[in-house]
Amino acid sequence: EFDKIMKRGVGLACLHYGVEVPKGAPGDHFLKWIGGYFETNWSVNPHWTAEFKVLPNHPVSLGVRPFAINDEWYYHMRFRQNMKGVTPILSAMPGADTLKRRDGAHSNNPHVREAVLKRKEAQHVAWVYQRGKDYEEGRGFGFTGGHNHVNWGSDNVRRLALNAIAWIAKVDVPKGGVRPGEVTVGDLQANQDYSPRGWEPEKIESKLKE
């Protein structure tokens, strides 16, 4: 049923845990819909500070400046063969300390060690996908961050997400990107069931002003 919707050219954005589906038919559909997904025993889910030093010339990155931010950035995603139709938006080089956990479905595996520790391949943690005519030229967006709610306080993160939503909806992204508005500590704390561990409003307020 959902594939029928995708074949009408409807855009699809998947964030954080939303990019993980089982290998097989679900994963194959994600490759058709958004170009990539988190595949167990292939992809990993460490917390680390990713440094995004260069951004591509693409509507989704308009107005987004190079930045660094700590999150549970999944990486070594399973993408379409030869990255056909996939454009990386956020890419960074994970440190060796992200691969110190024992092997497991989400933690570590020989494939990711080969890619990062030996071949030194930068890892794509946000990307866009242009579907073909069989899907009415629909568009997809994948973003592996989003575990740390406080990161929505970052203008760069909000602008990138808003740009992506506009792009997959086939709306022209403004030259400077979609305006992300202003977010306060109070906004970030609103409607949460409880304050996250280590929640320090003054520190967060200071970071938002940087």
Q: Language-model segments: what does each one mean?
A:
Residues 3, 31, 61, 161-166:
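Non-transmembrane alpha-helical segments in soluble domains
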Residues 1-24, 143:
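Short alpha-beta junction capping motif
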Residues 14-105, 177-210:
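An acidic, glycine-rich "communication" segment
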Residues 7-12, 84-87, 136-139:
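Loop/turn elements at helix/coil->beta-strand transitions in domains of secreted/extracellular proteins
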Residues 98, 105-210:
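Extracellular ligand-binding/catalytic regions of CAZymes and related secreted enzymes
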